């Protein structure tokens, strides 16, 4: 099974692709879609959709896992919600089933503790995927954790 994990945002969308065969999981790709803050929000969303389409065409995931947010009062909230909408729409266009997980569930599934620190989650991601180097940037590592959660919570 191939899973695309996504950590949505308007400035940076983290992504991670994992493949599971015979119970063994491995990372195929990870990175970020970074948009330029000088561009309009609409142009940034078009860029996210285009880059996500490219990733889907390359890796052909069977499932997508997206980090689910619980927002607090923040001026950035609307931008993240809009970027998430672009992600959901793009996945729907490709008919890719999607699951969502809140941060605490991701931490619990991957690190074994719902209040795990970022470095504990990163260590768990590295261990689960047999990585020698930590995935960078953090958004990509977070997306891999989301993808792993989809596999571990199946």
UniProtKB/Swiss-Prot annotation:
Main location: cytoplasm
Binding site for Mg(2+) 1: 7, 139
UniProt xrefs under CDD domains: RuvC
Name assigned to this protein: Crossover junction endodeoxyribonuclease RuvC
UniProt catalytic activity: Endonucleolytic cleavage at a junction such as a reciprocal single-stranded crossover between two homologous DNA duplexes (Holliday junction)
GO molecular function ontology, one term from the record: DNA binding
Functional description taken from the UniProt entry: The RuvA-RuvB-RuvC complex processes Holliday junction (HJ) DNA during genetic recombination and DNA repair. Endonuclease that resolves HJ intermediates. Cleaves cruciform DNA by making single-stranded nicks across the HJ at symmetrical positions within the homologous arms, yielding a 5'-phosphate and a 3'-hydroxyl group; requires a central core of homology in the junction. The consensus cleavage sequence is 5'-(A/T)TT(C/G)-3'. Cleavage occurs on the 3'-side of the TT dinucleotide at the point of strand exchange.
Cofactor binding summary note: Binds 2 Mg(2+) ion per subunit.
Family, as annotated: Belongs to the RuvC family.
Gene Ontology cellular component terms for the protein in this record: cytoplasm; Holliday junction resolvase complex
Subunit structure: Homodimer which binds Holliday junction (HJ) DNA. The HJ becomes 2-fold symmetrical on binding to RuvC with unstacked arms; it has a different conformation from HJ DNA in complex with RuvA. In the full resolvosome a probable DNA-RuvA(4)-RuvB(12)-RuvC(2) complex forms which resolves the HJ.
EC number of this enzyme: 3.1.21.10
Cited PROSITE patterns: RUVC (PS01321)
Subcellular location: Cytoplasm
Catalytic-site annotation from UniProt: 7, 67, 139
Originating species: Synechococcus sp. (strain CC9605)
Cysteine disulfide links: none
PANTHER family: CROSSOVER JUNCTION ENDODEOXYRIBONUCLEASE RUVC
Binding of Mg(2+) 2, residues: 67
Pfam annotation, one family: RuvC
Assigned keywords, A-Z: Cytoplasm, DNA damage, DNA recombination, DNA repair, DNA-binding, Endonuclease, Hydrolase, Magnesium, Metal-binding, Nuclease
Cofactor(s) needed for function: Mg(2+)
Biological-process GO terms, alphabetical: DNA recombination; DNA repair
């Amino acid at each position: 099974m191939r899973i695309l994990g996504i950590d949505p945002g308007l400035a940076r969308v983290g992504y991670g692709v994992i493949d599971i065969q015979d119970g063994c999981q491995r990372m195929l790709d990870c990175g970020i879609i970074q948009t330029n803050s000088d561009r309009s929000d609409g142009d940034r969303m078009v860029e996210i959709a285009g880059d996500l389409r490219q990733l889907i065409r390359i890796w052909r995931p069977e499932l997508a896992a997206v980090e689910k947010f619980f927002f607090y009062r923040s001026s950035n909230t609307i931008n993240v919600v809009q970027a998430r909408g672009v992600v959901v729409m793009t996945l729907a266009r490709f008919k890719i089933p999607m699951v969502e997980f809140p941060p605490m569930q991701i931490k619990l599934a991957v690190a074994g503790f719902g209040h795990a620190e970022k470095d504990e989650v990163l260590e768990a991601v590295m261990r689960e995927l047999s990585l020698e180097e930590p995935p960078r940037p953090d958004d990509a590592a977070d997306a891999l954790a989301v993808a792993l959660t989809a596999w571990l919570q199946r």
